[in-house]
């Protein structure tokens, strides 16, 4: 908006339990995948699929909502070379603005694939598609608004925007953001 802007990181947040270190993935389409099932306090590898609001306990994997009563943002930790509280999770109001409330919101996001990874593409308010690439809003291809949320009436929305790593670099340099659909956490799975 004219009075507020948010910044997205270069890639997914990742955590190394054995070293107690946080970092961002090198690319927006990078994600850990099945290795997330190794989640444990002493795991000597990187994970990037956390329980919601577990910034103070990133290896917590309970499936009970009562175990997550206090939200702790991951940004309270030092991430890479950044000091604690440099980064934070967007608020609900900020997500609502991006997907629903900003001018032309329905035309500024879509599902797509970057380098073979499915996810969501978010465009800035002042978007102009760069030459050499294309963009199709998923709302023109079967993603519908029901008055309170979007729902998918067509199962192939990820195929509407398919980019190679090089094509995505062009999109990213123009301000596009890609959030990989990396899965969901259910206990240690």
Predicted regions and their residues:
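Conserved positions within compact, well-structured domain cores
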Residues: 1-189
